[in-house]
Amino acid sequence: MKEYIEFLKDKMAISCQTGFEVNPDELTPSLYPHVKDTVRWAVSGGCRAIFSSFGMQKTVTQLEILRVVLKHKGGKGLIVCPKRVVVEFLTQAEQHLHMKVTYVRTMADVMICPTDIMVTNYERVRDGEDGVRIEPSYFTATSLDEASVLRGFGTKTYQEFLPLFADVPYRFVATATPSPNR
């Protein structure tokens, strides 16, 4: 049993808190209490994973997290999601948070984007267009939606995303299906 405990300890990665405290009054008033709690918890950690069941407002939670971080720290935010979910982010942002979010395809789009929060799909970051990908290091805060795509340790997406996002100060992932990577 002792060997197994040591094995588990070797696999643990302890994350330091790199975030900041958020006053509840700073949050969008119409959010559900569980969303407000999740946003405050995530921002206080600075780099957190959100495992929330379908229908628990992960989309709005991620948007609010990025809004709060950018309000305090400046810069731009990027949400990376499957292509089929992009429209959901655009509509939920306006419907629930009264904010405009822009879909970006290239770094050129990013550089001229008028909104603070942008959304793109995984392939735009992983593969890019004509070999030029969107650079996560440009952003102050990022969130990876449907992060279950990262669960396969040997996949191209997993292997490429870890180093790409290493320099982003505020990193978040959200999924309804937590699963170990290694």
PLM region descriptions:
Residues 54-55, 168-182:
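Conserved helicase ATPase motor motifs in RecA-like P-loop NTPase domains
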Residues 1-169:
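SF2 helicase/translocase NTPase motor core
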